[in-house]
A protein has these predicted regions:
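Alpha-helix N-cap and loop-to-helix initiation/capping positions
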Residues: 22-26, 61, 123-131, 159-163, ...
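Acidic-and-aromatic substrate-binding clefts and catalytic sites of carbohydrate-active enzymes
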Residues: 26, 88-90, 155-158, 187
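Alpha-helix-loop-beta-strand connector modules within alpha/beta enzyme cores
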Residues: 71, 133-142, 225-231, 235-237
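A structural motif
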Residues: 77-78, 144, 176
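Conserved strand-turn element in the central/C-terminal portion of the radical SAM core barrel
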Residues: 114-116, 123-125, 138-160, 183-186
Length: 269
């Protein structure tokens, strides 16, 4: 991935990459493979992307692989949900609108910090949070629902009520459908731990030592503010009608909807 997020789990050795993380493997025939798969599907479903590598890295502007895949999804009448940190997804809002008119399209956007200067440090090659917020608003204005991921919250850095409230305000103003948050903290494994600590040494003096003292070699680094902040997120979501809870939001993301079937049902009524 080209985003350079200092906390990225995909750097972990468990994924057995045999090249530099910053070197991009391009699946040039992605749209052809997708089309062949969709042709064989007996039932329509939701197609998702963005779990391991962002579909809107800077290289996508040139390659247009994601756009070609969206065109295939639209052609065959499937639904789609993409997870990204990039405002570049705006380029394809026309296709998301077409897909959503016939079935269901959902934008998933990750937000980590309401502090733009901090955002540029921990996510150096990504659209800043304000740009992501504007993207969420634009999708809502075009009738396309969105889900926001709150992840990760780095202990002693962005695991504060002030930050959470700033992100929640963005979500309320953008009228997001749901929020996913597994907890306040992050995970570190062999491979990404070393890179993360090297970035802490560069940008946050003495922070690595604080992490090692507090968490040792743990995989799960849970913030001491976890319960307080998770309750805060839950309370605000409940008060503003925002879906919250991993099971509920995932169920919504996975559920395929056909506008044509809905219309025919109403026609019969």
């Amino acid at each position: 991935c080209q985003h350079g997020c200092i906390y990225c789990d995909a750097r972990s050795k468990c994924y057995q990459m045999n090249h530099r993380f910053e070197d991009i493997e391009v699946k040039e025939n992605a749209s052809e493979l997708l089309e062949n798969a969709l042709k064989r599907k007996r039932r329509k479903c939701m197609i998702g992307t963005g779990a391991m590598s962002d579909p809107y890295i800077p290289l996508e502007k040139e390659l247009k692989l994601t756009r070609r895949c969206l065109e295939i999804i639209d052609r065959y009448g499937f639904g789609v949900t993409v997870q990204t940190k990039s405002a570049s997804v705006m380029r394809d809002i026309d296709l998301f609108t077409k897909i959503n008119d016939k079935s269901k399209a959902v934008l998933q956007m990750t937000l980590t910090t309401a502090d733009e200067s901090l955002c540029r440090i921990i996510e150096p090659n990504v659209s800043v949070t304000k740009e992501r917020f504007e993207t969420l608003k634009a999708f809502h204005e075009n009738g396309i629902p969105s889900v926001v991921w709150f992840s990760p919250f780095l202990p002693f850095i962005n695991d504060t009520k002030e930050n959470i409230d700033g992100l929640l305000k963005y979500c309320i103003d953008a009228k997001v459908r749901g929020i996913i948050c597994f907890g306040i903290g992050l995970t570190l494994r062999d491979g990404d731990r070393e890179y993360f600590y090297s970035r802490l040494d560069k940008h946050f003096p003495n922070m690595k030592e604080r992490y090692i003292y507090t968490y040792g070699n743990s995989y799960q680094l849970t913030s001491s503010n976890n319960n307080l902040l998770m309750n805060r997120i839950s309370e605000v979501c409940r008060n503003h009608g925002i879906m919250f809870g991993v099971e509920n939001v995932f169920s919504y993301l996975h559920k395929f909807e056909s506008k044509a079937e809905q219309l025919s049902l109403f026609d019969r009524i």
